[in-house]
Structure formats: C-alpha cells, structure tokens
Amino acid sequence: MPNPNPTYNNYTHAVNQRIPDIPAYIQFMWGDYGSRIRLSGLLRNMTYRQYALEGMDAKNKTQMGYGLQLSGNIGLGNIVTFYYQGTYGNGITSYFQDGSGQNLDMFPKQEALNELVTPEAWGGYVGMQFNITERVFASATYSQVRVLSKDGFYQPDYYKGSQYLAVNMFCRVKSNMMFGIEYLWGKRQNMDNASNTANRIQTVARFNF
C-alpha cells in the first residue's frame, strides 16, 4: 500500500493507509515511428491522525490528492524524435523525481497546526533525440519542477523547485559496445528563494557479454 510523504508536526501523526492510489490513462498512437500522446490521471486518499486540542477530540482526517499528466513523443522519420511531459496536481509532490523524499505531499496549515494541507505542484520536461548516423546519436532534455506554497507552515530551507538540463552523445562502436559523454546542469531553489547550481560532466562505457 503506497504511503504519502508528508511533513508531520507535534499535532499530527502518520496512520496506516487503507485506500491505494488510483491511476488511469488513455493513449493514442499514430504513424510509423512510434508517435503517441497519453493523458493520465491519479487520485490519492491520504489519511493522518489529528491529536486532541482544546475543544477538539483526536481523530483521523483525510485529504484528497489528484494529478493530471500529458505526455508523449513525436517521431520525425528515423532521424529526430521529440518527447515531452507536463504534470500538475495537488498532494502529489512525491511523484516527481526531484520531489521524492522532500515530505511535501502534505504539510501543516498556518492557521490550524493540527491540520495538514496539500500543496499544488507542477513540473515537466521537453527533449529531443537526434540520430546522427546509425551508430551515433545525441539528445538533450530540459525539465523543471515547482511546489506552490499555499496556506502552509514550512521552513525557509524546504524544497520549492528545481531545473535540470542534460546534453549527451552516444556511439555504438559495435553491437555489444557503447561509449557516451554527458553534460548536466542543475539548480535548486528553497522556499526562501535561496538557490544554488551545480555542473557535471560524466562518461559511460557499456559492454554486453
């Protein structure tokens, strides 16, 4: 059973979830080069425990989360393929790769610390792969994720968003041998708008036996 990834405080507590996340999608494909478009949806039922406060009894409370995603790729012959994905939702931050482990599916409400709210979040990427020859191809991808703080009690260093850029080139020397090089750039921004960037160059060699 999947568990939500919230930020708890002294007035809230985790409980076992009873309803799984519910996904659904529809997809359309066309052409001879694998072009497709997919619309996906997700519903989440996230339950937590409210501790007793003055005039209130302890009880379980549930927040609903949801997500919508549009994704796909467009093949232009055997040379160029474009791919894309866009996601928006409420209480789904852990479904983003950069948001996983940030404890932002829910966090305490400013006006009532024994209540959790679900922040809005959006993200997506665009990319392209270019087949230079039968053995050499290059690709580039740019992605961005953003968590929208609303009615939430959060720390200044909580995750707010990130950007990512990757550019690479690969060469298939033989059917069982491949070499590649990649440049990566990334940026993280916190809720107080403090940010930092990082750069990396990496290489890879793959041999199949």
Language-model-detected regions and their locations in the chain:
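Internal metal/ion-chelating core segments
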Residues: 1-52
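Alpha-helix capping and helix-loop boundary segments enriched in small/acidic/polar residues
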Residues: 13-14, 59-60, 193
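Detector for outer-membrane/organellar transmembrane beta-barrel domains
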Residues: 30-159
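Short, solvent-exposed loop/turn segments at secondary-structure boundaries
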Residues: 153-156, 191-195
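Outer-membrane beta-barrel "beta-signal"
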Residues: 171, 197-209
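A short, acidic, flexible beta-alpha connecting loop/helix-capping segment that sits on the rim
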Residues: 183-189
